[in-house]
Amino acid sequence: MENKKKKAVVVFSGGQDSTTCLFWALKTFDEVATVTFDYGQRHAEEIECAKEIAEQLGVSFRVLDMTLLNQLTESALTREEIAVKDGENGELPSTFVPGRNQLFLSFAAVYAKQIGARHLVTGVCETDYSGYPDCRDVFIKSLNVTLNLAMDDQFVIHTPLMWLDKAETWKLADELGALDFVREKTLTCYHGIRGDGCGECPACMLRRRGLELYLAEKEGDRA
């Protein structure tokens, strides 16, 4: 495989998407490290979940302090007094944190350079997402160029989920032998509940719909 004997850094939150990407990276690269960001998210459970998953999968885990984001912007992901809701009339969801993926990938690249890794893996997706502008493919491609110019390096940002909807993301996890692991051990819920979550927030509903659709399609293929 082309990427074998290469080292990768996975931007890791312990959620469904980044955990699926971690399994993908473990199949794709020889050495994998994870980096998680503490940006003042409303449930610290996310960081603990990411740490536990990294330990179970035997990959290095590092937390970087990005709490300054909470000083610069207000979001439902960082402020408990802000309700979690989808965007309406073209507005962004209340969970959008401006600049988050740009900063996370930039700092991940600095860390990658330090440990000799040239591959960055992130779970952003433009197909079945909440409308975040920093999840778009055009942004990732632009940032990839910027990072290489800024650090005079040849980083490659991998986005295994970019063109997958949630059902297809579950399918990928299943193909990687990780469906049950992802379903039971990850944290997607905006209210900090692991596994199937609260079932009511936008993240849980998207995750559940995708899983139900994939399982129905899988059962149909068996019939």
From Swiss-Prot:
Q: Which domain of life is it from?
A: Bacteria
> Which Enzyme Commission number(s) are on file for it?
6.3.4.20
Swiss-Prot/TrEMBL keywords? ATP-binding, Ligase, Metal-binding, Nucleotide-binding, Queuosine biosynthesis, Zinc
What does the entry list as the binding residues for Zn(2+)? C189, C198, C201, C204
Q: Name one Pfam family in it.
A: QueC
* A Gene Ontology biological process term: queuosine biosynthetic process
Keyword Glycoprotein, does the record have it? Answer: no
Primary role: Catalyzes the ATP-dependent conversion of 7-carboxy-7-deazaguanine (CDG) to 7-cyano-7-deazaguanine (preQ(0)).
Q: Subunit notes for this chain? A: Homodimer.
Sequence similarity: Belongs to the QueC family.
Q: What is this protein called?
A: 7-cyano-7-deazaguanine synthase
Source organism (scientific name): Halalkalibacterium halodurans (strain ATCC BAA-125 / DSM 18197 / FERM 7344 / JCM 9153 / C-125) (Bacillus halodurans)
